[in-house]
């Protein structure tokens, strides 16, 4: 029972770190990366469809994304979706290929992105701490039902705390890498 609780907590903490990494991929740095457009979608046959399902997105160079639309009619919709997003990008269309040059980030924009990234990291830490709280609550319930001893309770809480510390350190490492990436000129 204790091992199941620890394993569940560890898996959920790892998922929280992965979710943070995925969220940070969508935040624009100075470099072109296809995941930058992963949050955008277009109206396609009456349904909202992610851009990466109706087009091929590649990084042409470090400052340009190239989007090859599968259906020529969608080129205008994809271009409009990119312009309407809060990414501050101006796509240029040439038939079925849309080029999206990424302007260099201003110092002010970099600092605001760092604040956003720190907020995301803090949300990740809070999620990990909530997982720890849930796991410790489950352990306390076992102790209350006399299914485990107080020694087992204390030892398990210490082990869960170690898992929490590892997850928070991973979040801090991911944050440091992203901040460094954002502040590079």
UniProtKB/Swiss-Prot annotation:
Main location: cytoplasm
Locations listed in the record: Cytoplasm
Gene3D superfamilies, A to Z: 3.30.1360.40, Ribosome-recycling factor
Protein name: Ribosome-recycling factor
Assigned keywords, A-Z: Cytoplasm, Protein biosynthesis
Source organism of the structure: Aliivibrio salmonicida (strain LFI1238) (Vibrio salmonicida (strain LFI1238))
UniProt entry tagged with the keyword Cytoplasm: yes
Example GO molecular function: ribosomal large subunit binding
Matching Pfam families: RRF
UniProt key word Glycoprotein: no
Function: Responsible for the release of ribosomes from messenger RNA at the termination of protein biosynthesis. May increase the efficiency of translation by recycling ribosomes from one round of translation to another.
Family membership: Belongs to the RRF family.
NCBIfam families: frr (TIGR00496)
An annotated GO cellular component: cytosol
């Amino acid at each position: 029972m204790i091992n199941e609780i620890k394993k569940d907590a560890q898996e959920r903490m790892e998922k929280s770190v992965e979710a943070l990494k995925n969220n940070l991929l969508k935040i624009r740095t100075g470099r072109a990366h296809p995941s930058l457009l992963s949050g955008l979608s277009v109206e396609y046959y009456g349904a909202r469809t992610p851009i990466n399902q109706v087009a091929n997105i590649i990084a042409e160079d470090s400052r340009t994304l190239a989007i090859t639309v599968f259906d020529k009619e969608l080129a205008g919709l994809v271009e409009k979706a990119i312009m309407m997003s809060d990414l501050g990008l101006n796509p240029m269309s040439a038939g079925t290929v849309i080029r999206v040059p990424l302007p260099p980030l201003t110092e002010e924009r970099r600092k605001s992105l760092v604040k956003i990234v720190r907020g995301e990291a803090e949300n990740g830490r809070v999620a990990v701490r909530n997982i720890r709280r849930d796991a410790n609550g489950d352990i306390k319930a076992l102790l209350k039902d006399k299914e485990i001893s107080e020694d087992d309770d204390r030892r398990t809480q210490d082990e869960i705390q170690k898992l929490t510390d590892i997850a928070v350190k991973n979040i801090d490492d991911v944050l440091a890498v992203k901040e460094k990436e954002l502040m590079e000129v």
